[in-house]
């Protein structure tokens, strides 16, 4: 990603910190990019997926992500235990709160893929596949 907002961190008073890419160390910024996500994609990986999606840098395929949109601090208690307190939340560059919702893919995919007789995914060869993939459109934004 060249330049652009990566994430907003919003605290309970409504203060919004902006984290941006400066474009200085960009690698392959104009090459096609596809990101595969699922319900195991959480926290920092959700931030990355949301930033790439909202900045139109990548096409996101898969299932909605986990939805870990809160930032917590743990405070030590005198008995040795700790108390986790939510102190802020993440917003994507489009100001989407991902907590409990996740990043919604541009192109949904099923949780499992049909396979051919050799055990390989048959999605790209079968135009009627439930995968909803089209090889010619795979990298279009």
Region locations from a protein language model:
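C-terminal "post-core" interaction segments
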Residues: 1-141
């Amino acid at each position: 990603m060249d330049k652009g907002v990566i994430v907003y961190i919003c605290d309970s008073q409504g203060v919004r910190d902006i984290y941006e890419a400066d474009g200085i160390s960009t690698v392959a910024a104009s090459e096609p990019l596809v990101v595969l996500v699922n319900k195991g994609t959480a926290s920092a990986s959700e931030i990355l997926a949301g930033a790439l999606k909202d900045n139109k840098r990548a096409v996101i395929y898969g299932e909605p992500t986990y939805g870990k949109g809160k930032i917590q601090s743990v405070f030590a208690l005198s008995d040795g235990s700790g108390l986790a307190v939510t102190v802020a939340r993440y917003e994507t560059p489009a100001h989407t709160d991902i907590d409990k919702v996740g990043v919604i893919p541009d192109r949904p995919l099923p949780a499992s893929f049909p396979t051919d007789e050799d055990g390989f995914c048959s999605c790209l060869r079968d135009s009627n596949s439930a995968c909803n993939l089209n090889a010619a459109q795979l990298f279009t934004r």
